[in-house]
Structures are given as structure tokens and as C-alpha cells.
Amino acid sequence: MSNHTHHLKLKTLKRAWKASKYFIVGLSCLYKFNLKSLVQTALTTLAMITLTSLVITAIIYISVGNAKAKPTSKPTIQQTQRPQNHTSPLFTEHNYKSTHTSIQSTTLSQLLNIDTTRGTTYSHPTDETQNRKIKSQSTLPATRQPPINPSGSNPPENHQDHNNSQTLPYVPCSTCEGNLACSSLCQIGLERAPSRAPTITLKKAPKPKTTKKPTKTTIHHRTSPEAKLQPKNNTAAPQQGILSSPEHHTNQSTTQI
């Protein structure tokens, strides 16, 4: 509709321009015939008409420009916003279903991965629990359970002797028949049963310390043959003195008599 009105206005302007041309030609003819008064009046009227027509055309163009600016801006905004805001319900439902199923599949896959690492799945929980119970019952008599205190709290473990100690359960002496190790470890009566299981500590044999004995340094001096003979003479002298001493005593006793 706006384009149709615009074409009509252009046609009217063209017709007015043609009419003004004819009017100017007629005035020029009158001027040639020396009709000045009529020409002056005609020129004044033509000037007034042109001024009014120019004002009217300016107003029309301004109004048409404003009218064009408003509808052209609105459709552009609507065209840009339509695909974002107004979507078909089928498209949205399909997207919602696809996203919902994808989220469920991802969560289930994550849970299955976690359960496979732990050794369990959601498919058969009852069978697995039964199998676990059977396995635990079958393994109970084979495994040794640690003793429990009457107070209900286990004694603190020594982490230092953890590697070198072994805990043994309570063994009555009636079961030991000819076993020396069993008879040495068994307890007689329930009253003597210890609150804590006996521990056998495996002590490591200490390594023998090797001490090096200091070596005596012997110094050999060269001696002359005369020096070697001197101690023999010295040793012989006291023997003579010892042998001559009783004779000397006898001589003294005789002189006294």
C-alpha cells in the first residue's frame, strides 16, 4: 500500500510540473503582446502556486519518510527475533526429548562405569548379594578372626612389631596330643585364657661384631756376638753365688764354735 500511494504522489507532482510549464509559456506569449499588467498578475499567482506546491511536497516527503522508517524498522526486528522466540512446538518437543534421553544415557553410562570398577552392576543386584553371602560363609572357617576384648574395643596395635609378630588364637591343651609346640602354647582352663592372643616375635639374630686386634710391632736390633754372650755369663754368676752360699754358712758356723 505504501508503494502504491508513493507512485500516485509522483504522478500528481509530474502533472503539476507540466501545468506550470504550460502556464509559463502562456505568460511569455502575453508578454510579447505587451500585456504587462496581466503578466505581472499571472507571475505573482504562479509564484504563489509554486511556493505552496513546494511546501506541500516537502510536507508529503517528510510524512512519507517517517511512515517508511517506522514499518521498515519493525519488520527487521521481528524477522531477527522470530527464529529465537517463536519456534514450532514439534521442534521444541523433539529437542527436549533428544536432550532428555542424551542426559539419561550419559548418567546411566557413568553409573555403569562406576559400578563396573567396584565390581557391581544394576542388572542383577540380588544375585550378586547372594553370591557374596555364599562366598563369605564359605571363607569364614578358613580365615582366622582376631580376638575381641570383653570391653568391645580392640587393643592398640604396635606398628613397630607388625612385621615381626604373629597372633595365634586360643588353643586348649586337650587338643594337643604329642605336639611339643602345641603344649607349650596351649592354656589350661578358660580362666587362664588371655584377653589378648599370644604373640610370637621373630627376633633377628644380631650380626657378630668383628673387632680387629692391634698388631704388635717387633723391632729387631742387630747385636754383636759379644753382647749375646754377656747375659749367659751374668746368669751363671748368681748360680755360683747360690751354690757357694751354703759352704760359706758352714765355714761361719765352724769359726763360731
From Swiss-Prot:
Q: Which residues lie on this side of the membrane: Cytoplasmic?
A: 1-37
Q: Where is the composition biased (Basic residues)?
A: 204-222
Which pairs of positions does the record mark as disulfide bonds?
173-186, 176-182
On the Extracellular side, which residues?
67-257
Locate the site labelled Cleavage: 65-66
Question: Where is this chain compositionally biased, Polar residues type?
Answer: 73-90, 150-166, 231-243
Keywords annotated in UniProt: Disulfide bond, Glycoprotein, Host cell membrane, Host membrane, Host-virus interaction, Membrane, Secreted, Transmembrane, Transmembrane helix, Viral attachment to host cell, Viral immunoevasion, Virion, Virus entry into host cell
List the Pfam families.
Glycoprotein_G
Top-level taxon of origin: Viruses
The name of this protein is Major surface glycoprotein G
- The species this protein belongs to is Bovine respiratory syncytial virus (strain Lelystad)
**What gene name is given for the protein in this entry?**
G
